[in-house]
UniProtKB/Swiss-Prot annotation:
DNA-binding region range list: 556-622
Summary of the function given for this chain in its UniProt record: Component of the FACT complex, a general chromatin factor that acts to reorganize nucleosomes. The FACT complex is involved in multiple processes that require DNA as a template such as mRNA elongation, DNA replication and DNA repair. During transcription elongation the FACT complex acts as a histone chaperone that both destabilizes and restores nucleosomal structure.
Designated gene of the protein: hmg-4
Protein name from the UniProt record: FACT complex subunit SSRP1-A
Region (Disordered) residue spans: 434-697
Chain intervals with Acidic residues compositional bias: 461-473, 493-502
Organism listed in the record: Caenorhabditis elegans
Entry similarity comment: Belongs to the SSRP1 family.
Amino acid sequence: MAELQFPGVYVEDVGHLAFGTLKLTEKSLNFKGDKGGKSVNVTGSDIDKLKWQKLGNKPGLRVGLNDGGAHRFGGFKDTDLEKIQSFTSSNWSQSIDQSNLFIKGWNYGQAEVKGKTVEFSWEDKPIFEIPCTNVSNVIANKNEAVLEFHQNDDSKVQLMEMRFHMPIDLENEEDADKVEEFKKAVLAYAGLEAETEQPICLLTDILCTTPRGRYDIKVYPTSIALHGKTYDYKIPIKSINRLFLVPHKDGRHVYFVLSLNPPIRQGQTRYSYLIFEFGKDEEQDLELALTDEQLESSNGNLRRDMTGPIYETISILFKSICNLKITVPGRFLGSSGTPAIQCTHRQNPGLLYPMEKGFLFIHKPAMYIRFEEISSCHFARSDSGTVTRTFDFEIDLKYGGPLTFNAMEKEENNKLFDYLNKKNIKIRNSQRVENTVADSSDDEIDPYKAAVTAEGRQRDDSDDDSTDEDYDLDKDIKKKKEDKESSEGTGSEPDDEYDSGSEQDSSGTGESEPDSEQDVPSKRRKGEPKEKREKKEKREKKEGKKGKKDKDPNAPKRATSAYMQWFLASRNELKEDGDSVADVAKKGGAKWKTMSSDDKKKWEEKAEEDKSRYEKEMKEYRKNGPPSSSSKPSSSKTSKKSSGPSSSKAISKEYISDSDDSDDEEPKKKEKKAAPKEESEESNNGSDGSDESDDSD
């Protein structure tokens, strides 16, 4: 058997059960979290002992390591024990011991530090155990030891502290203090050595943007201590899981970021990231108090005397102590020439860095979004013409709600779009944005000018791309009426203060400019001869008559399928309180699939009967023929002709008349007087719609 895989298994991580998949191979044990959180990799040679014991309310596997640490996995089945035992014995030469927990509920026993865990037991039977790495502090008070624990943001209920009462043995008062010995043993394995020992180096007056302040930093082999004016922090090296080094957008500063798990606390606020800010030209000499063994283990990266820019020396120091790689930006460059994109998140300004394997946002709140956690991305308000200079960038996560970054500069759109395509990240409802003159201009934005420019650009595109056969006159007239109604209905649009009506001047007297109606279409069809334009309009009118036929109300009802017959009869049974129409249809489809052929037979017979009924009625309908109506074509023809020259010409927004004018009919008369040439041409073509409209007036 090459490997074993167990999905749905969970691992204990600082009081939180992180679900994932456990894989056993010939040489190692690997656990990967479902949500990209906790991951465990252990080689077979590092395993000291395996125990089969309960974790929570299900069977679990305790993996003891040679260095005294342990990993606990749960969520197995009782039948998995034989599979794991045969696999570990054949590949790792390890047997599994079954360990039963003492579950009588007694609150007294022996508290001992075994390896890197605190085990509380009674008569050599374990009651519970606590990894020393979960301990944040130990306080000794006479005959009482208090353990304070790190907090995990993923856990809803967290253990804050635990107190052990260790009574003094009156017969052996000269023995060493049990509480003090217990404290030293826990601190040694928890990576919380006392500060009495000499630190590796001391960094003074370092600017920290998160949490805000200036701190003196003492770097120890297993921890770092931050001392500020108000707050002090002590961070174990093992809680640092990522290092980032990114430049600021101004090119003069650099951010050095430490990712922490578990985070540090300041009152009720938790900080999962430490962000240090350094000047790019700032230099400082460091003297490192390192032993020869520590220098050798750093592979030549560290020296006792280090000089250079402070951000470089500190990043190299943390890289060697934490044994982690430093993540730097990839090949992405924004419009500023740096990998930083300026934006806001929840009204807090910051910088977004597209990295090789995720997005880093600095700084409030700082976050790192891995590509594995992203479902899709969306560019919002990126196609709104030339009015806006910014757009919103949304990231949809597989687990959790979307993250929105607002007020990104328009120039970053295409660069970010190409970056996502290279990383094969799904983009929904977006496309590249064409650069326009208005977008690159530094002048003040004129909303009216921008709207007219955008409208003209759309009109030019439609004239160039479309052919005569694709043009539909009725649709064009209907669209212009809708545009007119929408522009009249809203009072907040910038066009309202400029819409004056093509037939009236600003004085409201009803006098119209004679050339105003002729100038707009002549600009659009400048190079087109007049006779050709008239023929084209005739062709457009003929093509405009084509459309979808109206449904005859006398036509027979179509046949219903077997599924619809059953669904309509069973709809009340399927519907429950609060169900929508879609929910009921979904339930019906699922139930229909599970039904047997015998159950469906009844409804299939009904469907056949309905089908034969439809065919019979359809023959009678075709034989008699559909009812004809002579009134509809003439009325439609008259209405089309009455639209006259004004409806066949595209009217810009600046020529749309206001519907609130009291003398709507008077401008129409004066318009016909102002353009007698066009009326004569229409009358020569046999159109008498204008005369009818004049008579009606």
